[in-house]
């Protein structure tokens, strides 16, 4: 096992512990608490994968951080903070929408890279909006917290979430997963739109009809799907 992988996990465990103390003292806001809960599940998954005890890793992580802080001068810390861009937390969904439980009549689940895609295949001919909570850096999506698909009535019919045992994903991973979710929902004649906020930070542009810009590969796939549907309709007639 790579030593850097172990030390990274140990430091992450200790930093999570510090953030938990912040929440216990009622100093954290809603996004802070949301990230804390999700990181806790991620750490459990990583600990299981690495075969490491979280409590023991936290103690070692504390020693690593204390050693770094002891050697770090105040001036170096100021320079580091000044040169490091701060990420922002973007919220399309309310806390209620983010935490609400939902159920599927015809569940379908697919893993796309480090992301898990879930959708209800029973949903047909609905207008659906994709909304997400995520962090942004340099005006680009950095980390997806959670994406959900909502009908006009407010029902949740789809979701994209990071895999707890597979930490880390890129903006391309997110866009690919969104493409898969849209394709799955549109197969049942649903009309899918993406929130302007998500369009802006994931694609850097906003489409008037609410759809994300499609790659040539996605356009070819949609064309093949449309041709197949036409053939099926003709056979049915």
Curated annotation (Swiss-Prot):
In terms of one coarse class, where is the protein primarily found? host cell
**UniProt record, GO biological process:** symbiont-mediated suppression of host cytoplasmic pattern recognition receptor signaling pathway via inhibition of RIG-I activity; symbiont-mediated suppression of host gene expression; symbiont-mediated suppression of host mRNA processing; symbiont-mediated suppression of host PKR/eIFalpha signaling; symbiont-mediated suppression of host type I interferon-mediated signaling pathway
For region RNA-binding and homodimerization, the annotated ranges are: 1-73
Where does it reside? Host nucleus; Host cytoplasm
**Describe its PTM?**
Upon interferon induction, ISGylated via host HERC5; this results in the impairment of NS1 interaction with RNA targets due to its inability to form homodimers and to interact with host EIF2AK2/PKR.
Q: Does the keyword Thylakoid apply?
A: no
The signal peptide stretch is none
- Motif Nuclear export signal, residue numbers: 137-146
Q: Where is this region: Disordered?
A: 205-237
UniProt GO molecular function: protein serine/threonine kinase inhibitor activity; RNA binding
Compositional bias, Basic residues, is annotated for 217-237
Alphabetical keyword list = Eukaryotic host gene expression shutoff by virus, Host cytoplasm, Host gene expression shutoff by virus, Host mRNA suppression by virus, Host nucleus, Host-virus interaction, Inhibition of host innate immune response by virus, Inhibition of host interferon signaling pathway by virus, Inhibition of host PKR by virus, Inhibition of host pre-mRNA processing by virus, Inhibition of host RIG-I by virus, Inhibition of host RLR pathway by virus, Interferon antiviral system evasion, RNA-binding, Ubl conjugation, Viral immunoevasion
Is Ubl conjugation set as a keyword in this record? yes
The record's region (PABPN1-binding) falls at 223-230
Q: Which domain of life is it from?
A: Viruses
Pfam families registered for this protein in UniProt: Flu_NS1
Give GO cellular component annotations, separated by semicolons: host cell cytoplasm; host cell nucleus
CPSF4-binding, as annotated region: 180-215
The short sequence motif called Nuclear localization signal sits at 34-38
Q: Which family does it belong to?
A: Belongs to the influenza A viruses NS1 family.
Q: How does it assemble?
A: Homodimer. Interacts with host TRIM25 (via coiled coil); this interaction specifically inhibits TRIM25 multimerization and TRIM25-mediated RIGI CARD ubiquitination. Interacts with human EIF2AK2/PKR, CPSF4, IVNS1ABP and PABPN1.
Q: What does this protein do?
A: Inhibits post-transcriptional processing of cellular pre-mRNA, by binding and inhibiting two cellular proteins that are required for the 3'-end processing of cellular pre-mRNAs: the 30 kDa cleavage and polyadenylation specificity factor/CPSF4 and the poly(A)-binding protein 2/PABPN1. In turn, unprocessed 3' end pre-mRNAs accumulate in the host nucleus and are no longer exported to the cytoplasm. Cellular protein synthesis is thereby shut off very early after virus infection.
Question: What protein name applies here?
Answer: Non-structural protein 1
Species annotation? Influenza A virus (strain A/Alaska/6/1977 H3N2)
